[in-house]
Amino acid sequence: MTTAARPTFEPARGGRGKGEGDLSQLSKQYSSRDLPSHTKIKYRQTTQDAPEEVRNRDFRRELEERERAAAREKNRDRPTREHTTSSSVSKKPRLDQIPAANLDADDPLTDEEDEDFEEESDDDDTAALLAELEKIKKERAEEQARKEQEQKAEEERIRMENILSGNPLLNLTGPSQPQANFKVKRRWDDDVVFKNCAKGIDDQKKDKRFVNDTLRSEFHKKFMEKYIK
C-alpha cells in the first residue's frame, strides 16, 4: 500500500547526506544564460557621429553645398521646359499673321464673342433640361394618381363583394346571384366501415356468428349487459 498520502513529520533537509557537508558544492551545473554577456563597452565608430567627428564638422558649409547642388539640379531641368513652352507658343498662329483672304464675317474674331455664344448655348440647354424634367415629373405624378385611383376602385369592389357574399339574405334577393344551396354537407365519417354497424341488430334474428370486431361480438355485448348496464 502506498504511503504517498501520509503527512511528512520529518522533511528531508540538505547537508545531512553523504558528501553534503558544504551546500555550495552540491551541484556543478549552471546555465549559459547565467554567464555575463556584455563585458565590453561599445564605442561609436567612424560615420556614427562620434563626439570628435561632430566637433570637427562644419555644418554651415555642408548646408551651403547641398543648397547649391539642389539649385544646379533645378536649373538643369528649367531650359528644357522653357524650350518646350516657347515651341508650343510659337506653333499657335497669331491674329496678325492670318492673311486677309482667310478672314470671313462668320469667323469669330474675339474671345468675348465666343464666351457670349457659349453662355447662350448653355442657357438654352439648361432651359431644355428643366422643361424635360418638369414634363417627366408631371407624367410620374399623373401615373401615380391613376394607380391610386385604380387601387381604391379595386378595394371598393372587393369590399362590396364581401358584404354581399357574407349575408345569405342579400344573395337570395339578387336576380343575377345563383340559388343558394342550404343542403347540409356530408360528414367525413359517413362512409366509414364500422359506422352504424350495430344499428338494427336487435331487430334481426340473433344468430351466433363470428364477427371480426371486438365491440360487436356476442361476448362483449353480454359482458356489457351483465356488468355495465
Curated annotation (Swiss-Prot):
Region Disordered, residue ranges: 1-133
One GO term describing the cellular component: nucleus
Modified residues (N6-acetyllysine): 18
Modified residues (Phosphothreonine): 47, 110
GO MF annotation terms: RNA binding
InterPro entries: Cwf_Cwc_15
Modified residues annotated as N-acetylthreonine in this record: 2
Pfam families per UniProt: Cwf_Cwc_15
Ranges annotated as biased composition (Basic and acidic residues): 52-84
Composition bias, Acidic residues: 104-126
Chief location: nucleus
Quaternary assembly: Identified in the spliceosome C complex. Component of the PRP19-CDC5L splicing complex composed of a core complex comprising a homotetramer of PRPF19, CDC5L, PLRG1 and BCAS2, and at least three less stably associated proteins CTNNBL1, CWC15 and HSPA8. Interacts directly with CTNNBL1 in the complex. Component of the minor spliceosome, which splices U12-type introns.
Descriptive protein name: Spliceosome-associated protein CWC15 homolog
Organism: Rattus norvegicus
Gene label: Cwc15
